[in-house]
Amino acid sequence: MDKKWSLEQRWLHLLNQQFLDCLNHLFNHYRRLSTFQKPPSIIRHMFSVLALAIQILANVNVVAQTTEAVDLAPPPKVRQIRIPGDILIGGVFPVHSKSLNGDEPCGEIAETRGVHRVEAMLYALDQINSQNDFLRGYKLGALILDSCSNPAYALNQSLDFVRDMIGSSEASDYVCLDGSDPNLKKQSQKKNVAAVVGGSYSSVSVQLANLLRLFRIAQVSPASTNADLSDKNRFEYFARTVPSDDYQAMAMVEIAVKFKWSYVSLVYSADEYGELGADAFKKEARKKGICIALEERIQNKKESFTESINNLVQKLQPEKNVGATVVVLFVGTEYIPDILRYTAERMKLTSGAKKRIIWLASESWDRNNDKYTAGDNRLAAQGAIVLMLASQKVPSFEEYFMSLHPGTEAFERNKWLRELWQVKYKCEFDTPPGSTASRCEDIKQSTEGFNADDKVQFVIDAVYAIAHGLQSMKQAICPDDAIENHWISRYSKQPEICHAMQNIDGSDFYQNYLLKVNFTGKTISIFSSFRLSPFSDIVGKRFRFSPQGDGPASYTILTYKPKSMDKKRRMTDDESSPSDYVEIGHWSENNLTIYEKNLWWDPDHTPVSVCSLPCKIGFRKQLIKDEQCCWACSKCEDYEYLINETHCVGCEQGWWPTKDRKGCFDLSLSQLKYMRWRSMYSLVPTILAVFGIIATLFVIVVYVIYNETPVVKASGRELSYILLISMIMCYCMTFVLLSKPSAIVCAIKRTGIGFAFSCLYSAMFVKTNRIFRIFSTRSAQRPRFISPISQVVMTAMLAGVQLIGSLIWLSVVPPGWRHHYPTRDQVVLTCNVPDHHFLYSLAYDGFLIVLCTTYAVKTRKVPENFNETKFIGFSMYTTCVVWLSWIFFFFGTGSDFQIQTSSLCISISMSANVALACIFSPKLWIILFEKHKNVRKQEGESMLNKSSRSLGNCSSRLCANSIDEPNQYTALLTDSTRRRSSRKTSQPTSTSSAHDTFL
């Protein structure tokens, strides 16, 4: 027997898919044929029988794949409940859980997911049937089946929905002359199923939809969220009052993004719900940059179930699954308690232990299931974040359910209530007298601790949608039909309904009526081309089907936060709130709202679930093996910004990264650098220049006061004033150099410095050149161009060369400013010529310095009274040292414009200071402190003799004009002395050209 059954299994596995494809092809051909004429009834019967046979084969195939049993176990005692009515609505609910024992198809009775949903459907039918004007006298009945949470068993049970259709007499053997079907009275009492509410599990709904689509029966699920069920090419008669898992996956991903959980583990069950939900989550996670650290599949077979959970918990250990503290759950309801139990045991969780795992669970998490939080399970479940389809409680239903009591009609019509009572209250029905067993008839329900199933509202919405679709269809195709007005209904126990409503075309009903149901506020409206039919919604919730037949996408986000383990909640929560689940947010149509005050963690201490911590500002991610969520941090260069998390790019010249390193800003707008007056680099040169100007002005004042004294005259007043003015010009250049660069400032800088130096050193050169010519001449004639006017003209001509050259330079390169970039992070406002061009301007001044130094060296041996050249020489030597030092200092600190500018200012001032001190300080000393040397002497014989000896080397031609042209030196002598000296010697004392050699 075993061997034979195995062969059949293999044969059916090979042929089942071909049969289903063939059947679909035949039915499509039948639909096209029926458009023109009705085929004989025998053909339609053959199609129906073939469809039934193929579904049985499919059922056997599914059973063979999901169980190892050879024979199907006997079904439970109560297979279905039937409520009479004019139009039947089917129902498929998981009244029993799935058995993990392969020998039995059904497990324990499920109160919330099973019995509550069955009663919700019956309650909705009662509400609709109680309104006499709704279907104008038609009553809705029900045929409700138990799926036992098993797809194969549910498919087998669902054949009852199509048996009535196969055995009905609507396929008449008679055809009217015009080719239409005859309108015959039905002889059979069997009723066709107009639509089916169910199933709950997606795997059950898929199998059910595959069967019902062959017979064009509409299906409305109140709980199945499988994304594939939205595919109208495969499930053209399927609708649901809940959203697709695609939306749930989007909500879960947005929660992870909200809390910055970029590295999570994913656990899913080996069924359509788990696998499709996991695929949807992975798809959305990739879009948001969330990585899957661990992906584990939970096997649903008994022998491999425990092993897969053990492996899962082992892999979730913190030392093995580093970083991923968040675990996303897409598993069946029945698997979660075992996962929690094994987690608590293997990880040795205690009430005071730090939470290691945060569950992010789909709506399959049953908050009303006590097994989830029994014993140590609550330690593992604490802090879990659970998505629940946004639903509202139905107080009238809860009141109705609490009124159910053995012996009442409402109780006895649902045979599964007896089983629930026996299991829940440990009692027995119909106990014999004297029995010690508790009597179920005496037990009444208590409202304490009662929580209706979360999907009661969706079951009621599904029944309402079907009912109002039927109402709209009846108004369209049987507008004048009313049972209470039909004469047969007055005398017949089987009232006759509209013929078009007896055999409903599922395709027409689904497309034109069911999908157009729209719940608005407290009313339900069916929009069609005929009428608007209002009806009160039992929960006042807006509802409508999407074009794919899905319900509104809205989720409530809960967290498991038991009072017994949460001191804060015990202090703040109302004692009347018994639930251990706290609402922490809501998600609807891509809109996530989180109530942070209800979270079990502080908003500033959100749990971390990442592979790598975020890089600091200025660091880029260096991905590890192309893993999007795992990286090492690498520092960017100071001048680089991040175009994304993994690439640094340098800013353009003159730009610098912002503080957040997300872009660059223009340095010239906020950090433009130029000499500031408050800077130490400006204060020192300014002070030096001010003191130099004051000292120079003091010398000028002294010279003006003592302008007619011998010392002032002997120093050469004209050139002395030129020298002093040139020094003031040098000092003033400091203020020009320290000013903010502009066209005018740059023009003065390019001309003023060179011109000031040219005036200074031209005058010195004229002085030393004249002395050299005087003492080096061998002729008796007086040297040319040694008069004061000649000296001034020569000085002006020499300085004019520099001025003309500077003006030509300005015309060739107009003055202006520019941005200079000494380093990547600096922008300096400077003049629009390079530094080496500035040296070209000073080259001429350097040439004058060299000439002055040369003549100073040549005239170093002149007589003592003509030793002013010694001071000029000392001034030139010092100036050369200053300028050589400045050149190396200036170009050696090319990256610091402040040092360059400050050193240039100091060098210019020092050049003027050296000239001022060396040339004028000896004269000032005599004028101010040795005044006896600055007067005319009446008796100057001794001086005359001394002078005569000093002038022994003068040529006779040079001294010939001494009587006619008195000079500064002879001004110190009296007229008589001068005459005596003139008579006594054949040579003149001196010429006017030697006036500045006195000192």
Swiss-Prot record:
Keywords: Cell membrane, G-protein coupled receptor, Glycoprotein, Membrane, Receptor, Transducer, Transmembrane, Transmembrane helix
Low complexity bias locations: 984-993
Protein topology in the membrane: Multi-pass membrane protein
Positions glycosylated per UniProt: 518
GO CC annotation: plasma membrane
Signal peptide start and end residues: none
Annotated function: G-protein coupled receptor for glutamate. Ligand binding causes a conformation change that triggers signaling via guanine nucleotide-binding proteins (G proteins) and modulates the activity of down-stream effectors.
Official protein name in the record: Probable metabotropic glutamate receptor mgl-1
